[in-house]
Amino acid sequence: MESPTLLGLLLLLLGGPGTSLGEHRPDYDKEALLGGQDEVEEFSKLSPEEQQKRLKVIISRIDVDLDGFLTEAELSSWIQHSFKSYIIEDAKQQFQHYDKDGDGRVSWEEYNIQMYDRVIDFEEDTTLDDAEEESFRQLHLKDKKRFQKANKDGDSHLDFEEFAAFEHPEEADYMKEFVIQESLEEHDKDGDGFVSLQEFLGDYRRDPAAKEDPEWIVVEEDRFKNDYDKDKDGKLSPKELLTWVMPNNEGLAQEEAVHLLDEMDLDGDRRLSANEILENQDLFLNSEATDYGRQLHDKSFYHEEL
């Protein structure tokens, strides 16, 4: 089961429900953008001089060739770095919660206690009569299978690297086949090894009284046909499924870099100077380039000696 923090981040990166992959997400309030109420309060207490000082250090770290400008490639690379840093930090925080005995490993029992306050064990081949209980049993078994797959060395415990793969399988190459299979089990209703457009849309059926599909269906169909179905055969193969269930962080980062250039490049040279960024400080802070402002509170990003 993916952690809420990861789900939130992925929704931000993907633009949220009902948003096209190529469409930039709408504005979010300061609390969401800066990572929480504590971060908002801390940032509001900084003087304008301190805000700009921290921001300038981050700008200098993005500027790999030290020419005083940020290119699309430099912005994209930094955003990917920002994303990975967030994932590692999130996994570390989660790991501390799950590792109840502090031995540096997480057992299946510890995972259950943290998630459900008790150890749960369902029979894999038993179907429960109660629909809600059966739905929960299925989710629990999916968690168990993911835990077992992440347990690369088979010792029944997850070390930190394995736990990170369990929490964020999209970041672990050895989890790809499992994620594809998991997706097929969920969406491939006819068992043909592919996901059709109807299976992709799930249980949606147009209201007989409606003259046209709702906007979100139009958007999802467009994503299916133009972003995921590369060979245009009307269905998603296991390889094509990866672009849906395991989005390419490189592509997402490039989209954000292009967006920043489109919005902030005042002289049209397709690169950003420090002055252009400082003149659009709020936009830059509210982007993946600063992890929605979190980097201004993380010394590993803005401390000049690092």
UniProtKB/Swiss-Prot annotation:
Q: What range does the record give for the signal peptide? A: 1-22
Asked whether the keyword Metal-binding is assigned, the reply is yes
The UniProt annotation places Ca(2+) 4 binding at D265, D267, D269, R271, E276
List of residues binding Ca(2+) 3: D229, D231, D233, K235, E240
Q: Name one GO cellular component term.
A: endoplasmic reticulum
Show the SUPFAM superfamilies listed in the entry. EF-hand
Stretches assigned to the EF-hand domain = 50-85, 86-121, 144-173, 175-210, 226-251, 252-287
Keywords associated with the record:
Calcium, Metal-binding, Repeat, Secreted, Signal
Residues involved in Ca(2+) 2 binding:
D188, D190, D192, E199
Matching entries from InterPro entries are given as: EF-hand-dom_pair (IPR011992), EF_Hand_1_Ca_BS (IPR018247), EF_hand_dom (IPR002048)
Name its cellular compartments. Secreted
What does the entry state regarding organ or tissue expression?
Answer: Expressed by the venom gland.
Give a yes or no for keyword Metal-binding in this entry.
yes
Q: A Pfam family name for this chain?
A: EF-hand_7
Q: Name one GO molecular function term.
A: calcium ion binding
By its UniProt entry, which PROSITE patterns does this protein fall under?
A: EF_HAND_1 (PS00018), EF_HAND_2 (PS50222)
Q: Where does Ca(2+) 1 bind?
A: D99, D101, D103, R105, E110
The similarity comment for this entry is: Belongs to the CREC family.
Subunit: May bind phospholipase A2, since the rat reticulocalbin-2 has been isolated on the phospholipase complex taipoxin columns.
Q: What's the protein called, per UniProt?
A: Reticulocalbin-2
